[in-house]
């Protein structure tokens, strides 16, 4: 019986390949807690970044070679997340989540993002409201 003829061995190869790919991936995950009266201004800056990303990571610019996925979120902050019936605070939570093919792609991303006219504002927001700043995080679990 050939090595590839055994479905179990083929499955092991597939899993090992996925583990190798996963081990190369790196992430940027940023979390912000922003006063509600500043949330729209913060979101406007984040929308500038997402618009830049749409172009920078387009197929024409070989984007899939560097960026795997990206999503930005906005949610009211609960007083008690274990009991949402207690209501929300006067703050909004934003997250920026970007998954890259490698740490080199993150370096490329940061280097190019810093050239944008909105980036000083982006940095100010990070300094003022950033609560979780992770550049180059390793994925240790993922579904899809």
Task: Please report, for each region that a protein language model flagged, where it lies by residue.
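Short S/T/G/P-rich N-terminal loop/turn motif that feeds into the first structured element of a domain
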Residues: 3-112, 128-144
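ADP-ribosyltransferase catalytic core
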Residues: 117-133
């Amino acid at each position: 019986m050939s090595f590839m003829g055994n479905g179990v061995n083929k499955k092991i190869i597939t899993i090992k390949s996925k583990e190798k790919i996963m081990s190369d991936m790196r992430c940027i995950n940023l979390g912000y807690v922003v006063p509600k009266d500043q949330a729209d201004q913060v979101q406007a800056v984040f929308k500038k970044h997402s618009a830049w990303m749409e172009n920078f990571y387009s197929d024409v610019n070989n984007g899939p070679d560097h960026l795997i996925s990206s999503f930005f979120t906005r949610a009211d902050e609960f007083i008690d997340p274990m009991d949402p019936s207690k209501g929300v605070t006067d703050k909004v939570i934003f997250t920026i989540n970007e998954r890259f093919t490698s740490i080199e792609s993150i370096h490329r991303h940061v280097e190019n993002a810093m050239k944008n006219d909105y980036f000083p504002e982006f940095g100010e927001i990070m300094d003022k409201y950033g609560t979780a700043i992770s550049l180059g995080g390793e994925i240790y679990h993922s579904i899809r």
